[in-house]
Amino acid sequence: MSQSRTLRQKSQKYQENIEKRGVASPKKKEDGLNINPYVLGFIIFVVVGSTLLQILKGQ
């Protein structure tokens, strides 16, 4: 008994879906820091500011 054309197409579509299931697309990892520029600026501000205060208090 041969399958009808629509039944073959549905079967093939189902098989393709089964083969794709669970396959995650690879994501490219971005190079560089994963930190917000504002947070980085704040950290630099605190470090430089505290260094300047220490220098001024020492005089």
Curated annotation (Swiss-Prot):
Keyword Transmembrane part of the UniProt annotation: yes
Alphabetical list of Pfam families matching this protein: RAMP4
Any single GO CC term annotated in Swiss-Prot or TrEMBL for this entry: endoplasmic reticulum membrane
Entry keyword annotation includes Endoplasmic reticulum: yes
Membrane topology: Single-pass type IV membrane protein; Single-pass membrane protein
GO biological process terms, semicolon-separated: endoplasmic reticulum unfolded protein response; protein transport
Sequence ranges on the Extracellular membrane side: 56-59
Coiled-coil residues: none
Membrane spanning stretches: 35-55
Feature: compositional bias, Basic and acidic residues: 16-30
Spans annotated as Disordered: 1-30
The organism's place on the tree of life at top rank: Eukaryota
Keywords (A to Z) from UniProt: Endoplasmic reticulum, Membrane, Protein transport, Translocation, Transmembrane, Transmembrane helix, Transport
Subcellular locations according to the entry: Membrane; Endoplasmic reticulum membrane
Topology, Cytoplasmic side: 1-34
Family: Belongs to the RAMP4 family.
Function, in words: May interact with target proteins during translocation into the lumen of the endoplasmic reticulum. May protect unfolded target proteins against degradation and facilitate correct glycosylation.
The name this protein goes by in its record: Probable stress-associated endoplasmic reticulum protein
Taxon lineage: Eukaryota, Amoebozoa, Evosea, Eumycetozoa, Dictyostelia
